[in-house]
């Protein structure tokens, strides 16, 4: 699926790969819903009220949420919601590329580039739990070339990396500051 979507990504201060702590998720949720509506129009799929609500719940923050966390939040709105309801909605959203599943956490996070063909890299903060989707084609190329070099064909080149986000790096955290200096050369 490689469909250009019209909704603009948040370009306000604090809306970077890792939004600042005071970031208002309203724009993220609005963009996600607009993208979902547009993709559904393009593909003929239906964004039911339940699917829309689950998408909003996934986008309520930048932390990956497990299906049962989503169910717990959904039950505040729809007390009779059951696990299969959530899993069906998540499968629909995954199928359209509106969300991603973070395998190592068994959790879901909103896709920042729905409608575009891409392999994501996820940066997961071990301190605050937030995750950011990164798109670095050089990482994809290195993985593909490295795998091909040993006769391996990648089927799902999703990368999940744990570390500290900019908001959680403290000036007194010398190890993280040293790692940042080393990475920046």
Regions found by a protein language model. Give the residues of each.
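Pre-recognition alpha-helix immediately N-terminal to the DNA-recognition helix
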Residues: 52-57
